[in-house]
Swiss-Prot record:
It holds the Pfam family MFS_1. The gene is psiT2. The keyword Transmembrane applies. Belongs to the major facilitator superfamily. TCR/Tet family. One of its GO terms (cellular component) is membrane. The chain crosses the membrane at residues 87-107, 125-145, 148-168, 174-194, 220-240, 322-342, 357-377, 388-408, 424-444, 460-479, 493-513. InterPro entries: MFS, MFS_dom, MFS_trans_sf, Sugar_transporter_CS. Residues 1-20, 260-299 are annotated as: Disordered. This is Major facilitator-type transporter psiT2. It is found in: Membrane. Major facilitator-type transporter; part of the gene cluster that mediates the biosynthesis of psilocybin, a psychotropic tryptamine-derived natural product. The keyword Transport applies.
């Protein structure tokens, strides 16, 4: 063949080879793209067990809401002045969160080193025990001590967030995270229902609970039931919850592979005698894969400083602080506002009706998490949805401040009752208020997804812990701050007793401004 002929063939052969290679690569890319779109199967059993443990935390926290003000009043610490009850009940709720602040980071860091199970299960059991004992309190000091102890152990909550993140990936997050977020509103629906229904059970239901013990301790039963639910969850966790800490999971897989290889090598040696090839195969099979080797190199958790200086983590922490402060304040103020008599600046609802109102709010939040949140997370930008949720708070506090003037329009000072028409309007306003207040619930699962998106996987519990610390500090401060603000406003009749409304709306607007930083940081990262 002539050189010219050979030269003329070479480009064609080369082009054919490139075409085949490009076709092969395109098929591979298409297959990879399709594979990425297929959601990873959800570990239903593990998530079910984890949800049973997480389910009790909001119940334990919220079962106090309907009766805590009455409990404090019965203890006598407020000296019979209902205007000061809110201050002391706020302290009870604050010290629980203070205990969490003191232990969250320590427990989260510990779980990043020794595993999730050894920290999560004992902590949940301890919270259950101190919750049951709280119902036996006979003094304000005893109430404070028991709630602090429960709060110290409740600091393990971020570990649950980490386990959920480790059991899921980006392909099934949009489904699992809203389902996980559903646990909190369900707990917030059941907790107040338990508290409002079972307080003074011996008086309400003498045929069923007419025991002298329950007459002496009328708040024991609503504390004991959440304890029992927590014990059931811990029992399930002890027998069925698997360890998810990445370093421990990798070590277990490596050990299982070594055992399997040793067993095969042993049988092969027995049949044919040991050879260099067999030893080489065993050595290769127990070696780390490239992915495992990379994980092994990067398995050391990030330092606290590295997490804090990260702009995205700072934005999430700051926004989370406002979110938790405003969310908890709305619940605390609503409970106190409803408990306070109309002439003292409130609405004057009994504890059982307050419990029903919180239960309705929990059902609303549950339906939103189940029906709306998954679609929202798939359709819209997470940072923008977060900002939208924060916009609900100024409206919540503004509407809440209108309830007392509305109640006063139909209030009879002689009979201490509200006209039925006014009562209907009042309940309608409360329904709208609760709906607005539960819009922000979507922000909590979004916060969890943003943490996973921006934090190193080997420091996930620590990152969750840092965000949870900032949120828990807010939860520790807001019951005392908001209830004291309410008491000061009403007792001194500042702005007609509504100074607290003006201040809470102002804080809400500051929270909206802070939430915009998440969108700014996210956009900047995408541009890089």
């Amino acid at each position: 063949m002539s050189p010219e002929r050979s030269a003329s063939l070479e480009p064609d052969e080369h082009s054919s080879l490139l075409s085949d290679t490009a076709s092969y690569i395109s098929r591979d890319d298409l297959e990879d793209s399709k594979a990425k779109q297929i959601p990873t199967p959800i570990p239903k059993k593990q998530l079910g067990v984890l949800f049973s443990i997480r389910f009790t935390e909001p119940i334990i926290y919220s079962h106090l809401w309907p009766y805590i003000n009455q409990f404090v009043n019965d203890i006598g610490v407020a000296d019979g002045n209902p205007r000061y009850v809110g201050f002391y009940s706020g302290l009870i709720e604050s010290v629980f969160a203070c205990g969490e602040v003191c232990s969250i980071f320590m427990l989260s860091r510990l779980s990043d080193r020794i595993g999730r199970r050894p920290v999560l299960l004992p902590s949940a059991l301890g919270v259950a025990l101190f919750t049951a004992l709280f119902g036996l309190s006979t003094s304000f000091t005893m109430m404070l001590v028991l709630r602090v102890c429960a709060g110290l152990l409740a600091g393990a909550t971020p570990i649950v967030h980490s386990v959920v993140s480790e059991l899921t990936d980006e392909t099934n997050n949009a489904l699992v995270v809203p389902l996980y977020g559903l646990i909190t509103p369900i707990g917030f629906a059941i907790g107040p229902l338990i508290g409002g229904t079972l307080e003074h059970a011996a008086t309400k239901y003498p045929n069923v609970f007419g025991y002298d013990f329950l007459r002496k301790y009328p708040y024991f039963l609503p504390s004991f039931v959440p304890c029992c639910l927590a014990v059931v969850g811990v029992t399930f966790g002890y027998f069925f919850l698997q360890e998810t800490l990445p370093s421990i999971v990798r070590a277990k897989k490596r050990l299982e592979r070594q055992k399997s290889t040793s067993s095969i090598s042993s049988r092969t040696s027995t049949l044919y005698g040991a050879t260099d090839d067999h030893n080489r195969d065993a050595s290769e099979s127990t070696a780390l894969s490239p992915e495992e080797a990379e994980d092994e190199i990067d398995s050391k958790p990030q330092s606290i400083k590295a997490l804090i200086v990260d702009p995205s983590m700072r934005a999430i922490m700051g926004s989370g602080t406002f979110l938790m402060f405003l969310y908890t304040s709305s619940d605390v103020l609503f409970s106190l506002y409803c408990f306070t008599a109309v002439e003292d600046g409130g609405v004057g609802l009994p504890p059982d009706e307050i419990g029903y109102a919180f239960s309705v709010a929990g059902v609303i939040a549950m339906l939103m998490q189940l029906c709306i949140t998954p679609w929202v997370l798939r359709t819209f930008d997470k940072a923008k949805v977060y900002k939208f949720c924060m916009f609900s708070f100024p409206l919540v506090f503004a509407l809440m401040g209108c309830l007392n003037p509305l109640a006063q329009t139909g209030y009879n000072e002689v009979s201490k009752t509200i006209h039925p028409t006014t009562t209907g309007l009042l309940y309608a306003a409360i329904a709208v208020l609760l709906l607005l207040a539960r819009v922000c619930v979507m922000a909590f699962p979004i916060s969890m997804m943003l943490i996973k998106q921006n934090a190193d996987k080997n420091s996930l519990a620590t990152a969750n812990g840092l965000v949870q610390v900032s949120m828990t500090i807010a939860r520790a401060l807001c019951p005392t701050v908001s209830s004291s603000l309410f008491a000061y406003s009403t007792s001194n009749n500042i702005l007609g007793g509504h100074l607290w409304v003006l201040i809470m709306v102002t804080i809400s607007l500051a929270g909206v401004w802070q939430s915009m930083s998440i969108a700014r940081v996210t956009k900047r990262k995408e541009e890089l």
